[in-house]
Amino acid sequence: LLEKCWEKFEQYKDSDTTFNLKDHLWTLFLYEKGVFKIPDGLDDDTIYDGCNCGNCHFIISAEGRLMACRRFDSYVGTVNEELYDVFHGPKLNRYRQHERFEKCAQCELLRFCRGCPAVAFGYSHDFYSPDPQCWKQIG
């Protein structure tokens, strides 16, 4: 299915329409096709792309609840708290433990992908379990 979508994206790449490859597994797909290459000289501790849960945002619900991700119950605070403290606090930090990703921690795309931890959570009730949509064989 991704291959068919990619063919359409390529067919219409010069049109005025921009196609967003938002799903994180596009990174793996494009990596395997040789379109995406991991740049040399990157910092090993930096997250460059992929799921942003815990990394650079949180969600504010209509009720003022702060969530690490909109796709599963990931409460980290409220808008009544100091946002700096919430962002750097232990509740949000638990989503930043990238070495805990069971499968992704061993993958060269860890800093660019990580699949969808919310899908993994929905499937296994474990945020750090493998995204069941990921086809990459590790090890």
Regions found by a protein language model. Give the residues of each.
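Gly/Ser/Thr-rich beta-alpha loop segments that engage phosphate groups in nucleotides
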Residues: 56, 117
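Short, acidic, Ser/Thr-enriched surface-loop or helix-capping motifs
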Residues: 60-61
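C-terminal accessory region of radical SAM enzymes
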Residues: 1-40, 65-115, 121
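Short, small/polar residue-rich loop motifs at catalytic or cofactor-binding pockets
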Residues: 51-55
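Acidic, His- and aromatic-enriched active-site or binding-groove loops in soluble protein domains
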Residues: 41-48
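Short linker/helix segments within small regulatory modules
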Residues: 124-128
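Short Fe-S-cluster ligation motifs
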Residues: 104, 131-139
